[in-house]
């Protein structure tokens, strides 16, 4: 610093006497001294600090990615909420005058003012679904059955049939007179077909008695196999009893089978041989149907012409 001050004083003395020319070496030394002084003044307040040790502000790294995901998720939820709001607005038809499709009353009544498309309706406890006064309540299924269900009881209305399923039973009342038109409570009411119903289609029926009116016949028809079974026996009574079937008839009992009445067998459907056939020719085995005086039927194999029922092992005993 002293050398710099002396040089400055000498310069001032020389400058007072006029401009002084310096050599190249003196200029280089003076320039180097000025640069050193400038650099020392610049570094006087500088303290080098590592950037990793500085306090970081903002969201960086994983926190930044998580923040971006949260913002995108909130945006998607906002768009979905907007779409749901628009759909509800279009379906319910909310306008300046209120809701055009339904009305809410203080009594808890919800009234639909136009045709409504619904999937499943769950009425609350002790609630009622009905129509307006002097108007019909029309319920339509789009190519699907309409099902009314409460517990195990179910009413299904389809295109070609209506079925009712219940584990307890069912009763049909006249809404005006409250008279029972049809009931499955057989202990209290005798089972009768409703007026206008000509036939009853069931897969299995358990009852004590099946009867018909005095002026009509009782017809039991099945497509496959019919089984009539009684725990204490089966009794069939009628003026005329006819069995028509395409297969076999099997009468099976633990003790006995009693046919009390006139038994007729139509021979038109029984196979018969022509008069020219031989008695034992071919693969045919012929039998003759015989009957005892007490009505017992038995068969006798035909082994020759003009053969009768007088055989030794017939069940009639001495009476033929």
Curated annotation (Swiss-Prot):
Complexes and interactors: Cross-link to form 2 major subcomplexes: one consisting of SGCB, SGCD and SGCG and the other consisting of SGCB and SGCD. The association between SGCB and SGCG is particularly strong while SGCA is loosely associated with the other sarcoglycans.
Cell membrane in keyword set: yes
Glycosylation sites: 160, 213, 260
All ranges on the Cytoplasmic side of the membrane: 1-67
GO terms under biological process: muscle organ development
Gene Ontology cellular component terms for the protein in this record: cytoplasm; cytoskeleton; sarcoglycan complex; sarcolemma
Topological type in the membrane: Single-pass type II membrane protein
Biased composition regions of type Low complexity, renumbered to the chain: 1-10
Keyword terms: Cell membrane, Cytoplasm, Cytoskeleton, Disulfide bond, Glycoprotein, Membrane, Signal-anchor, Transmembrane, Transmembrane helix
InterPro entries cross-referenced by the UniProt entry: Sarcoglycan, Sgcb
Family that this chain belongs to: Belongs to the sarcoglycan beta/delta/gamma/zeta family.
Bias (Basic and acidic residues): 23-34
Record keyword Transmembrane helix present: yes
Chain positions covered by the region annotation Disordered: 1-34
The name this protein goes by in its record: Beta-sarcoglycan
Post-translational modification: Disulfide bonds are present.
Extracellular side: 89-320
């Amino acid at each position: 610093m002293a050398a710099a001050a002396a040089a400055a004083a000498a310069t001032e003395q020389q400058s007072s006497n006029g401009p002084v020319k310096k050599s190249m070496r003196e200029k280089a030394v003076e320039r180097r001294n000025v640069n050193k002084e400038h650099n020392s003044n610049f570094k006087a307040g500088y303290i080098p600090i590592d950037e990793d040790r500085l306090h970081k502000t903002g969201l960086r790294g994983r926190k930044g990615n998580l923040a971006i995901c949260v913002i995108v998720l909130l945006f998607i939820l906002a768009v979905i909420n907007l779409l749901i709001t628009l759909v509800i607005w279009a379906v319910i038809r909310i306008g300046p005058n209120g809701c055009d499709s339904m009305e809410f009353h203080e009594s808890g009544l919800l009234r639909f003012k136009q045709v409504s498309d619904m999937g499943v309706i769950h009425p609350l406890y002790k609630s009622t679904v009905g129509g307006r006064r002097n108007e019909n309540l029309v319920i339509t299924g789009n190519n699907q059955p309409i099902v009314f269900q409460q517990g195990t009881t179910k009413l299904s209305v389809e295109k070609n049939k209506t079925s009712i399923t219940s584990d307890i039973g069912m009763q049909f009342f006249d809404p005006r007179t409250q008279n029972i038109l049809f009931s499955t409570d057989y202990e209290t009411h005798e089972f009768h077909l409703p007026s206008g119903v000509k036939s009853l289609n069931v897969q299995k029926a358990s009852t004590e008695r099946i009867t018909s009116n005095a002026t009509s016949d009782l017809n039991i028809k099945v497509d496959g196999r019919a089984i009539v079974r009684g725990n204490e026996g089966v009794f069939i009574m009628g003026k005329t009893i006819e069995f028509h079937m395409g297969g076999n008839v099997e009468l099976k009992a633990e003790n006995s089978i009693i046919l009390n009445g006139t038994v007729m067998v139509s021979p038109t459907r029984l196979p018969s041989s022509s008069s020219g056939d031989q008695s034992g020719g071919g693969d045919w085995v012929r039998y003759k149907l015989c009957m005892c005086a007490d009505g017992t039927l038995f068969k006798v194999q035909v082994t020759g012409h003009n053969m009768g029922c007088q055989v030794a092992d017939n069940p009639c005993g001495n009476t033929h």
